[in-house]
Amino acid sequence: YDELHCHVRAKLGDVYGEDNVPQDGPIPAHLLGNMWSQQWGTLYDLMEPYPGVGDIDVDATLKAKDFSPKEMVRSAESFYASLGMPRLPDTFWERSQFSRPQDREVDCYASAWGMDGGNDVRIKMCINQTYDELRVIYHELGHNYYQRAYKDQPPLFQGAAHDGFHEAIGDAIVLSI
């Protein structure tokens, strides 16, 4: 991470000048896509590792293979399982919302839920076949796996020590896809 940070800071210093991006300090957040420095995708043109080679079109692949929303979630579950984490419980698959219901209005903003402080974890999304949505799925499952990791703790400890840690888990996993 330190090397990546140093590389990005140096490139930004070349573009914006060392007065704006000091080489011995943090990268100014407003140069990293949003004020929380979460979305570095806006830097891709500057950081592209192999200019001119072209991108992998994940959206087209998802559509060509006709991945359903549930299959997209299963791929994320398989990734977490490959890290030694348990498969999601059957209730997750029965009670989560993966697609927009046709019979009622719903809020489709993606969210993860730990319903009982135990194994009843869920996500609520209206999943489309896009790479961005796939990334959100991996992120939201990060919340669910973290919820399951602390389910056996006393109630006082059944939560993140800091809300940012919940976000960091999903965001760190998303870097792996």
Explain the meaning of each model-derived region.
Residues 1-177:
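Cation-handling catalytic/transport regions enriched in His/Asp/Glu
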